[in-house]
Amino acid sequence: MRISMMAETSPLERRVPAERPLSPHLQIYRPMLTMMMSIVHRLTGFANYFGTLLLAWWLIAAASPNGYAKFQWFASSWIGRLILFGYTWSVIHHMLGGIRHLIWDTGRGFGPKEREWLVAANLVGSIAITVVLWIFIILTTGVG
């Protein structure tokens, strides 16, 4: 009986890589509106968590005149209004995106034209509703 001094190769070491295509990488995709709006939908969902802190601050500030005065000072500053405007758009955009996803859950709107129309309607609708809402707020409250 002869003992070989050479180490045997394991089945993993003898394995030959399979000849199959690799998944395409994100860098080869041309950005599409649906892809961008999917990312924006996730970002607005994330931003809504932080915007809800503003809502909590407003509710907590209502407990004292001094606290409410501080919130009013922030909300009436240009940066406060910009943040509130952005939060308004974020909530509306995320809501319309949720409606778009509900439509997709029914199995409708997956054709190329329908998909692009829904995404464009989501974007245009969220901007239009936000602007109309803020015009209404400015006209009815005299904030300007």
Predicted regions and their residues:
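Membrane-embedded alpha-helical bundles that constitute the cytochrome b-like, heme-associated redox core
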Residues: 1-144
